[in-house]
Amino acid sequence: LSKVTNALVNPLSDKFLKMIIKKDNEWASKLVSKLLQEIDAKPLLLEVEISESTTPQIFNYLKSEEIAYLSLLGISLHNKEHRNNIVPLLLQRENDIILTPEWENEIKIGDKILLACDNHAKDDIEYICQNAYEFYYAITGKEKRTIFKGIK
């Protein structure tokens, strides 16, 4: 019952688990080392789908024929030059699945992404996906100033 529940509640996590059990110990050891080094011993799992309802800022950006990369989700809102504590675990585009995708992978509408991260990174990802000001900063490195436009 718990396997079925997990597959329904966390479908990407379930796919990830089914794929990694086919990998060898060396691959698994490298992944565990990367998780420990870049996050900690208890990373959070975050599933993100690029859609209008869950990631409206990214969705609208991609809909306007702009290009975005997985690295967008790793940007620190404290300092755009830094990456948060995140490890991409899986990228699913329709029926194609990439395990441990690179930051340089382009993201598209409909993509489903599984990330391991800490709480701070999770918060930044949610802000980037849903808040126009934070998204603008993540894309440009500049603060979006529209409230007092033209007033000095």
Predicted regions and their residues:
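Cytosolic regulatory domains of K+ homeostasis systems
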Residues: 1-152
